[in-house]
Design a protein with these regions (language model features):
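A short, well-ordered alpha-helix in the C-terminal region of glycosyltransferases
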Residues: 1-10, 18-22
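Active-site anion-handling motifs in enzyme catalytic cores
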Residues: 12, 29-338
Length: 338
């Protein structure tokens, strides 16, 4: 468990917003005011990235309600309806994106693991292009609590170094990300390690969380073990082993197994595959919950086993014990912090 002093030092709202405020002050423009453009993996039904979006947005508004924020999203309509944001534009509308970059005073890129080529080189190039174009238009750029890597291809590493070096402020969510950028040739004195923004997010009330669990048809006769699983190399043997682990936990601890869908429909599909191979009955939370609702429900569980980083962070915030499955370096990096 984190000590209170560590929480206050690294994860308070004021700490997480402080770097942003520094960037805003530099970007201030008397004619247009402060205009912020947020770029990230938003609008893809990924609860971790949606938590990052809402937390950054809320933290900025707490610091200065007069700041105008525009969000780039895959699904502007859903992002607007779900969170009530005023200005959301499609990240795929090329000319609209360029127009928003031109209007803004500062670009916030992140957080999350945007700069990696495990997903695809195309995804990496998209985020680098946004940063590059902002600098061409002489805008201030801040990498906000980014997780860096893995970036495996030599050409991609050179591109990351070239583009990221142009950013005005670079903040990272863990020490390993700093080491990765240093290995690419970016000086360490330009890199600031903070933490994932989601550490400042609050959950729904206990009463609301209990109600959501009840409405999902999960019985309250036993304690709950939360499972967060994601696709991994289409390995059927992996699915069977995960099912065996869940059955063993169910039998040895006499707890109900509850699968937590963090990225719909991907996580739902793999969760249902694992459930189908289990000997015992399991349950699933697969509705379109908000990040705060998921965090609240996790707070009612006795243990979390997760391949998803933000499931682990939600549990840590709720003081629920965790077991992380390190399919990606970011999981290892997080577990080393605990």
């Amino acid at each position: 468990e984190y000590g209170r002093s560590v929480i206050f030092q690294y994860y308070s709202v004021s700490k997480m917003a402080d770097d942003c405020v520094r960037a805003y002050d530099d970007a201030y423009c008397e004619t247009h005011g402060r205009r912020i453009l947020m770029s990230g993996y938003y609008g893809f039904n990924n609860s971790g990235d949606e938590a990052i979006l809402t937390t950054i947005y809320e933290n900025i508004c707490k610091m200065d309600k007069n700041i105008h924020i525009t969000v780039l999203s895959r699904d502007p309509k859903e992002t607007t309806q779900k969170y009530g944001f005023k200005d959301v534009v499609s990240r795929f509308d090329f000319f609209k994106v360029l127009y928003e970059i031109k209007k803004c005073d500062i670009l916030l890129s992140g957080g999350g693991s945007l700069l990696q080529d495990t997903t695809s080189t195309r995804s990496l190039m998209y985020y680098l292009f946004i940063i590059e174009w902002a600098k061409i238009m002489r805008k201030k750029v801040m990498l906000y609590a980014n997780g860096i890597g893995p970036v495996s291809r030599d050409h991609n590493r050179k591109m990351v170094k070239r583009v990221v070096s142009k950013a005005d402020i670079i903040t990272l969510r863990e020490e390993d990300s700093k080491k990765e950028l240093e290995a690419m040739g970016i000086p360490g004195d330009r890199l600031f390690v903070t933490a994932d923004p989601v550490f400042t997010m609050s959950s729904v009330t206990e009463e609301r969380a209990e109600r959501l669990i009840f409405e999902a048809g999960i019985p309250s006769d036993k304690g709950l073990i939360g499972i967060s699983v994601r696709n991994w190399k289409n390995d059927e043997d992996f699915i069977q082993k995960f099912a065996d682990i869940c059955d063993r936990i169910h039998d040895e601890f006499d707890k109900n197994i509850v699968f937590i869908v963090m990225h719909n429909p991907n996580d739902k599909d793999i969760s249902e595959c694992v459930m189908s191979m289990m000997k015992n009955k399991a349950y699933i939370l697969d509705k379109n919950y908000s990040p705060k609702e998921i965090m609240g429900m996790i707070g009612k569980m006795d243990l979390i086993l997760s391949m998803r980083l933000h499931t682990l962070i939600f549990a840590t915030k709720q003081r629920v014990p965790i077991v992380g499955f390190a399919y990606d370096p970011k999981i290892n990096s997080y577990l080393k912090l605990l």
